[in-house]
């Protein structure tokens, strides 16, 4: 046994040898910090986002095969990599050598925006292609199931994937026996001149071919080592931990005997997150990944024996092969396992996690254990004392001592028996998201009839997610033995199971009534499945299912993704080299795909750099009694702990009307408030020390978390805002009907893929400070840092190359973090880096404001709304931040597309004990618009009219005035509405939906269409000014810089297009380095959909200034080149640099009068969405979405369509699955992708069609273009209202005809519980106040 083992592996074809390996080191930081391969990104640290995906390759000398699989680098201990080859995004291609076809296609198909997730996407696709050079679309979408993107909406990524399929342009799903390529494009009609309809925005014939022979080979040295080098046990150790990797089963047993408490890990997908997130520490780790006996696959006459070391992906492949070869009656359990293996985690985790690890971990929401438990599986155990076999039953799953592994035992293999004739096994699960999400409830069920006539001989039912362990309803099953399989038995079974599988009202995870309902809904599904099989086997003996029940057995509508894009086509008069209006690729797209794009934390380490990490409050409202820093300061590598006392008189900064503390002084007002900051030599040391800071609190009253609690305590920020138009009170006197209602809307986490990141570097002279930061607002960072350091702003320079997503979340809270980081750097004269972990980021930074909307509407029987009185309440959190502006924008935009002749709307920002909420894409409109649309829905229901008819009746239709007296021309609004009606075939599909609903009791479809009027502008001229700087060099090349931030919206690409048009030179001649307060001072925040508008006009101004100077030179030498002209200008002492400036639009709003001109123009649009829901589980699927948008004249249709799609998917997440959970004490439960679910590739519409209106004049803007970044978020509510329509259909069929009020997000829980039926009535209900709930609806 080597006591000081060397670690040898390969990275991108290069040998790596490490002599002093720390077993706690994961591959991700090793790649990024040690090898400087920064293309692999940190996104969450827990394997939930896919940003750190790499390919791991291993050679098996026994099979003589190389296995490639994707893996999450954040979870891979480098000690486990001996003898492997690691391939990162840098290893498959680069701009310096040759880019790989995967990299090229994802870039040219416009599959990148901010680009932070792109390397992970690339590596997932690449790994699949190494194993399957011509994959199916199913394989590709499955490969991307573990990768998240917050920007694109996934459609262009899917398009890039399709190019590798054998039939790349086809959706691979024939309708009426005809390929989609042989039909008209998804039934879309041809449109007028000026538009082009296409399924794609790229030229596939330009792509590099995929050539498997050109891939990086597996290192021959590793093959020789595996075949010829004697295998030895390897030992790696540090001061804190030892890592043992035995080579034989005997050695493994010896280690386990010596270290009985040491965990045995294969993929580190369970132990790793526990150590990282839950503070669990193991001084000894045993890794048996080379032991052959743990990878056994034996076929016996009784069933399969699978080695505990097999990965879940390998188990899936083995079972898929078995079910193809064996008769169905033998493979019931295998089919059930395959069903859950298809959705369990993502491809990376399935390839890392082992079968044995999944079983032994015994997570209460395990997807496989309930199936294995009912399948009579047994576990083969081994220790130095000998072999033992135990059943995988409830006693084992609940860790009963007499049924568990002994500390010195290991799990060698699992026996999974064949099913028998007349034995049926099924599996069920429901999660917040369809794939890569832990189950809320899951279940395995088995019944055996023997040779009886439908009489139950054996019955097993197990549930996960409903207790601290998997629960088996053993007593219920025993009481049902001997019963006939009929509805009477079902009713008894439901009652018995509900009694046995009881859930406390305060059960962890919440959703208690939903879980109780799922328990018996799954049982009902199982009953129907078995009944249908029995009927098919013996139609005479067994009765047919009632027609209405058949739909319960069908999966939700699902086909392969397909899309069409209708975009503007440039006219014949435009110069062929003019790039404006062309779908030009994001100019950083290839760098995103190769990993060469540099983000803040990708910057190299600075000499003597320190790392800063924050200590945050664990109480929501408390007095700080004491802070003990002694233990933290005594730890190795710790340099300092910064407190409010150090900051003293610079411990606050005034954002708008009130100052906010950086670090808490004597009180805390939310969980997650910054208390102090630890400085250490490394990130690891800083984080360990932060855990040792001891803070004593004394709780204070009141604790206010919700809007209703704020109203009760009169806890508001000043001032109240009010908008009034017409005479509301008089109008209420003349209407036919009046209704009152309210809707609550939850918040939303920004979930930008790149967390808050910065590096502050003291320059060493004149007190200068460079701040490299991921922010939307460099000027603000400059101001707050300068103020904190008591320096003039000219000593602080803020630099932003690019931002890995922001959505409003990287402005003001980023400034607080930067101020403390800069203070630390200034105090110690050393560079300081601060990068928040995902959980810290979600805890500290706040997000979209939760809203409560109350409305009173007066309307006529024909649907005309004559009076509307509204109240808007936002949950601002503990400080004002931008909450007042959010309320103001919500009020100004609440009318959406409708003319309300008499309107009164008031808004309040509620002060609560939550982290301060802030700006978020849409800035109040997604909330305010939903309130208005909910009112429209209720008016329609009262009038007996369709919501779409009521929408059209009340819509702006011509030149009119908004409630704040700004003129509006609604021509394009009506055109969007009518075209959306046409392209979506709304009337035909509405009839089809009604027909479907009439024929299906347990599945329902819904169809909804919403209009959009989105005002664009910042409310004041000062906020809309912009500047740019353009240099022409003597070789004729151009450098441009401007005040806008590139955060995925493509503003830099558009600015280069502007320079190209104005100066008449190719795009390749123009370069843009980034944004800096050094080159463009005093730039406003990048947001509000106006970044390209404002900065583009400044760039245009600078270019025109240069052209005017150079006009005499160019006219004398019209055939010259830019190099010639630049040299001549230099020789004649003509400046080749110009500053461009735009003053901003004339904007204002007088809140006292409630009138003004706050916006420059309006974006119009419409969206139609169709969904299908499962009434028994609350699951839903977005079948199709059609969006029509007015974009004026698009500067770049590829970028604009990307913004529309990305915003829509983000909005869809907001209104459906994204749910923040807080404890009654104000602690955020949802702190990462495991708990908080943003849309994944499985959530995108099966059909996604985008249409841009033909070009239209928008005279005051850049080339008549319109900003689109924010408006599309609201269109996601078309999915919300389609679900509402489906739920309403279900309720009507069940005799429930009253008003339906559904809050947002419309999660599976809310959908299921709104579809009331006999099962929802059967469950026990907790009396209000009888228990303390796990979570509080914020």
From Swiss-Prot:
SMART domains: Ald_Xan_dh_C, CO_deh_flav_C
Organism, scientific name: Macaca fascicularis (Crab-eating macaque)
Matching InterPro entries: 2Fe-2S-bd, 2Fe-2S-bd_dom_sf, 2Fe-2S_ferredoxin-like_sf, 2Fe-2S_ferredoxin-type, 2Fe2S_fd_BS, Ald_Oxase/Xan_DH_a/b, Ald_Oxase/Xan_DH_a/b_sf, Ald_Oxase/xanthine_DH-like
Cofactor: [2Fe-2S] cluster; FAD; Mo-molybdopterin
Catalytic activity, reaction form: an aldehyde + O2 + H2O = a carboxylate + H2O2 + H(+); retinal + O2 + H2O = retinoate + H2O2 + H(+)
Keywords, sorted A to Z: 2Fe-2S, Cytoplasm, FAD, Flavoprotein, Iron, Iron-sulfur, Lipid metabolism, Metal-binding, Molybdenum, Oxidoreductase, Phosphoprotein
Cellular-component GO terms for this entry: cytoplasm
Domain FAD-binding PCMH-type: start-end pairs: 236-421
Name of this chain's protein: Aldehyde oxidase 1
Subunit description: Homodimer.
Modified residues (Phosphoserine): 1068
Function per UniProt: Oxidase with broad substrate specificity, oxidizing aromatic azaheterocycles, such as N1-methylnicotinamide, N-methylphthalazinium and phthalazine, as well as aldehydes, such as benzaldehyde, retinal, pyridoxal, and vanillin. Plays a key role in the metabolism of xenobiotics and drugs containing aromatic azaheterocyclic substituents. Participates in the bioactivation of prodrugs such as famciclovir, catalyzing the oxidation step from 6-deoxypenciclovir to penciclovir, which is a potent antiviral agent. Is probably involved in the regulation of reactive oxygen species homeostasis.
